[in-house]
Amino acid sequence: AADKLNMSQSAMSHALKRLRTLLNEDILIRTSREMEVTPYARQISDRVRQILTEIESTLLSKAIFEPATAQETFRIAASDYVEATIGINLVQQFAIQAPGIRIRITNLDKETVMATLDENRIDLIINARLPLKSWHVEQNLYREEFVCVFKSDDALTELSMEDYLRRSHLLVSMRDDFQGAGDEILERQQQSRQVIWSTPHFMAVPFLLANSDCVALLPRRMAQQCAKAMDLKLLSPPMTIEGFTVSMIWHQRNTNRPQHQWLRAQVIEATQN
């Protein structure tokens, strides 16, 4: 605990004693192995976090941010799908408005990304369907839908269920299986598709499609961009498949920071172009 706070063990001990006197409660107790958080500390942690965040946000809101001269690095957790669809516009916007700004895209691991945000190791998450705490802020960006993607010289002009099931499928999945969008619908109809390739990388799929007779369900925004660049064809699925909402998530401590407000405005603009 002392190392995380950049304090000596002696200073940490004195700080804990002062807190114990002030609160009339322990917040850390020593066990046989390590220091352990007490039930009281867990009980007040959310409220204390909110108060500290409000103080930090209030103080930082007075800062001035000039994009044209700023030298800053923003860290965004996002999938390669988001990077490919939004990043194209963001690169152009930053080059014109803020040439000194740098963006670091990090892997989006759903198991750890929220903790990374809380620890201030990233500034923003752009994704869909993540569990939030009370100190997280979410803003919807756009609604996405799925389309079926083939190589352009495929003879199909309309996709029937028979054609859909007959084809070999490529799947984008972050899970260790071959199940994805629409498979629950097929199971209810006692049907299944043949998934021959599962990958966590959205941007690998268009290259695979361009050199095979397979089909893949991809988000429309990404598919439209890849279709132009790689000569692919888009068709509607033969069944209704629920889409998803892409949103950005940040810690509330950054809500009033001018540079963070500017970043979020740029992301919104990038999704609208």
Name each region found by the language model.
Residues 70-132, 198-199:
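Central regulatory/effector-binding core of bacterial HTH transcription factors
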Residues 20-39:
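A short LG(V/I)-centered, amphipathic sequence patch enriched
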Residues 85-86, 156-161, 233-273:
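A late-sequence structural motif
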Residues 22-23, 44-66:
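Alpha-helical linker/hinge and terminal dimerization helices associated
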Residues 33, 39, 64-83, 97-101, ...:
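Interdomain hinge and pocket-entrance segments immediately C-terminal to HTH DNA-binding domains
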Residues 128, 156-159, 167-190, 220, ...:
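Secondary-structure junction motif
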Residues 133-139, 144, 203-252:
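Beta-alpha-beta core module
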Residues 133-169, 260:
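Flexible hinge/capping segments at coil-to-helix
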